[in-house]
């Protein structure tokens, strides 16, 4: 297959490109820079330089492909245009920075997925989009049949935008990723949590720390995207979860041991002071099952687990 991948030089997208190439597929990828284009070309993929707002480019690239994997994501200010930044801070004055960011993210994602879907319309070809486990129903082990909680920020807009094309002849599915997609080179949640503990001299958890986090290795996630592309069902929501529920206290305790700082309980009200923007996520109890995903696609996570990966990569000098 000829597969078009957005976010092709990102943390997850670059692993997806490598997985597809190793499986014998041809790949073209969207990247935002000339340096990214050079990286893709060295990997053996064709490169397009552009952004998610360039809908004509997305539509044309999708139409020329046999299928699309959408992993591109706006992670922060560095990923935003000047216009987006102005809108973000203007919106922050009317409802908060998180709400403003999520509105911009939803509009950008929905528009980009709409362009990709229109390029695949009436073809029966696959469109696989990245979504998230966060904010599925709390306090239970969420399954692939569950929908996101509607009154909090989540990635459900990506799923809705893709599934709108099912009735228009597109085999759309979603891969819901664990909040912790780990591996060598990770710059996501866990490195920020380690950095906060190193900076503040303490490794906290919320309350009793029994709330559960999911995790998946980057390479296992990449394999799941490939399988969803090749075999995925229209409307399916696959769970990119290698470990279904790790008590956050265990994560905090490992960090405390490796940094030689105390692990302590703090109330929710102090989470933002220590963790910054991640404060609202730390106390979530969001375990999730991958049973249906494994049975349906034959996906078997094979890489090392979160704690082994943390020991190997997350406490060296480069992680400071």
Language-model regions, residue ranges each:
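Amphipathic terminal alpha-helices
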Residues: 304-320
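Glycine/proline-rich active-site loop of Rossmann-fold NAD(P)-dependent oxidoreductases
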Residues: 156, 182-191, 199-200, 227-238, ...
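Conserved beta-loop-beta element that borders a ligand/cofactor-binding pocket
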Residues: 160-184
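N-terminal Rossmann NAD(P)H-binding glycine-rich loop of SDR-like oxidoreductase domains
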Residues: 3-25
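Substrate-positioning beta->alpha
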Residues: 185-194, 206-229, 236
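NAD(P)H-binding glycine-rich loop region in Rossmannoid oxidoreductase-like domains
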Residues: 29-111, 118
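Conserved C-terminal active-site "lid" loop/helix of NAD(P)H-dependent oxidoreductases
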Residues: 273-300
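Mid/C-terminal beta-alpha module of Rossmann-like enzyme folds, strongest
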Residues: 222-278, 318
């Amino acid at each position: 297959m000829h597969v078009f991948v957005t976010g092709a030089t990102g943390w997850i997208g670059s692993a997806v490109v490598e997985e597809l190439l190793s499986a014998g597929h041809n790949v073209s990828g969207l990247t935002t820079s000339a340096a990214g284009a050079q990286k893709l070309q060295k990997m053996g993929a064709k490169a397009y330089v552009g952004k998610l707002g360039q809908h004509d480019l997305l539509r044309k690239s999708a139409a020329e492909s046999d299928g699309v994997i959408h992993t591109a994501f706006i992670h922060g200010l560095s990923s935003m245009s000047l216009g987006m930044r102005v809108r973000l801070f203007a919106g922050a004055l009317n409802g908060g920075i998180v709400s403003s960011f999520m509105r911009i993210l939803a509009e950008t994602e929905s528009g980009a997925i709409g362009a990709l879907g229109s390029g695949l319309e009436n073809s029966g070809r696959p469109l696989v989009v990245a979504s998230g486990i966060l904010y599925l129903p709390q306090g239970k082990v969420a399954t692939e049949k569950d929908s996101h909680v509607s009154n909090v920020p989540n990635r459900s807009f990506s799923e809705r935008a893709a599934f709108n094309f099912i009735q228009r002849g597109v085999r759309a599915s979603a891969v819901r990723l664990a909040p912790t997609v780990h591996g060598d080179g990770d710059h996501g949640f866990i490195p920020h949590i380690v950095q906060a503990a190193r900076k503040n001299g303490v490794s906290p958890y919320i309350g009793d720390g029994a709330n559960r986090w999911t995790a998946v290795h980057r390479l296992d996630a990449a394999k799941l995207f490939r399988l969803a592309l090749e075999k995925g069902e229209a409307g399916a929501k696959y769970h990119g979860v290698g470990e279904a529920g790790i008590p956050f206290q265990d994560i905090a305790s490992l960090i405390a041991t490796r940094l030689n700082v105390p692990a302590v309980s703090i109330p929710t009200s102090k989470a933002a002071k220590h963790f910054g923007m991640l404060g609202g996520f730390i106390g979530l109890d969001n375990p999730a099952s991958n049973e249906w995903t494994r049975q349906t696609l034959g996906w078997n996570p094979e890489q090392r687990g979160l704690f082994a990966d943390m020991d190997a990569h997350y406490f060296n000098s480069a992680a400071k």
